From Swiss-Prot:
It comes from the Archaea. Its main location: membrane. This is Uncharacterized protein MJ1036. GO terms for cellular component: membrane; plasma membrane. Pfam families: Zip. Disulfide bonds: none annotated.
Length: 233
């Protein structure tokens, strides 16, 4: 493995570690005081990466089709595979059906999310985008780990075991992406990734307003501006 290939692997491992730290904080009930502000900045960053870097660099014949496919992929995952008990006013006294969904469906849907993060890291390396995409993944890992473990504490004796497995999806996705995507057109990868990021922003950013309406737009704008500054260099 060349030194260059080691970079995305390092980013994937770092993402795994950061997410595990978020899980530990949730496990020991350490509050993330600015969790929603940080998430808002990361969503703005994701939106900026999609609209200022990925989609413009993917311009080619039929690139819009792949952007739309990326957005549809996110929509289908959110609609049919994703499950978040926190959005359903989760409590430890849920009935057995709800408990089983939290115990099994929730971590599986989260694993899909982390695996896709890994694929995006691989795309960042293959397409030579580098830093902006790496940061977009890293920035939301701490709150993601916190959100993952919070409901699992009510259904697992030790929720860190499934948490670590879910977090490892980023490393696994990166390895799979580096092996399987290297011969795919860079333009297609960039367009599809741009669609994924744009879809993720449109699906997830509104949830921030449910928890933190105050100054949310400003935090999203800050994340977007950060990408603009990076894109100029």
């Amino acid at each position: 493995m060349s030194n260059m290939v080691e970079v995305p692997i390092f980013i994937a491992i770092l993402s795994f570690i950061v997410m595990c730290i978020g899980e530990l904080l949730a496990y020991y009930s350490v509050s993330l005081k600015y969790k929603y502000e940080f998430e808002a900045i990361s969503f703005g960053f994701i939106f900026g990466v999609a609209t200022l870097i990925l989609i413009p660099k993917s311009y080619s014949n039929m690139f819009v089709l792949y952007v739309i496919l990326g957005m549809i992929t996110v929509y289908l995952i959110e609609k049919y595979l994703a499950y978040c008990p926190l959005s359903k006013k989760y409590c430890v006294e849920c009935d057995n059906l709800e408990e089983n969904r939290i115990k099994f469906i929730y971590p599986i849907s989260f694993f899909i999310h982390t695996f896709i993060d890994g694929l995006i890291i691989a795309v960042s390396y293959i397409s030579e985008i580098g830093l902006p995409l790496y940061l977009a993944i890293l920035m939301h890992k701490l709150p993601a780990g916190f959100v993952l473990i919070s409901p699992l504490k009510g259904v697992y004796k030790n929720p860190l075991y499934p948490g670590v497995f879910v977090s490892f999806g980023t490393v696994l996705g990166t390895i799979v992406g580096l092996v399987t995507l290297k011969d795919v057109s860079t333009k297609i990868l960039l367009a599809f990734s741009g669609g994924v990021f744009l879809g993720a922003f449109l699906m997830l950013a509104p949830h921030i307003y449910e928890h933190k309406e105050e100054k949310t737009f400003l935090y999203i704008l800050l994340g977007y501006i950060l990408v603009g500054i990076i894109a100029l260099h």
